[in-house]
Amino acid sequence: LLVFDEETLRTMCRQFVGEFTSRYSNSFVAYASKAFLNQAIARLVAEEGLGLDVVSGGELAVAKAAGVPMDKLYFHGNNKSPEELEFAVESGIGRVVVDSFHEMGLLSDIARARGVIQDVMIRLSPNVDPHTHAHTTTGILDSKFGFSIETGDAARAIRRALDAPNLDLVGIHFHLGSPIFELEPYSIAIDTV
């Protein structure tokens, strides 16, 4: 049995949205579904103005069943199956965060077959050590996540996305790892990106 205090969750959501939008008016806060997701949580965060960050077809299905607007979803993950990408495009997902050239090709083919233009973001690997546990470090050169800036893959991925007629490159993304207790790795990564 899991018990959540709804008012506390709503207050936290409002605080996150309020803090970000008060400083950056064009901010968009997304709840990381991997933390915990069921239909009630999905509805609650959507009602409070947050989007959802989903990493699987299952999380996407929960969000869809909960009535979360699909344009408020970001689909992350470095191992999306063709079926999950098809489901995402078919569902009208807001953005797919692309992690590999293979995924970009699959997504482009699916969007073309459906006659849609899919918004995408490119996940970059800035090769920054966040000084955390090796198993949770995701933004270094040999990471399995994203396109390396240092090797030129990031520039090639951006060019390929811009050239794909059924993909609309709307942004870039990076993640360094967790937990991170220092600001310096973020500052270095932002300068690198």
For the regions a language model picked out, list residue spans one by one:
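Active-site loop/helix belt of alpha/beta enzymes
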Residues: N127-V193
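Short beta-strand segments
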Residues: A32, D119-S125, H173-H175
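A charged N-terminal "starter" segment
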Residues: L1-D119, A155, R159, A164-L169, ...
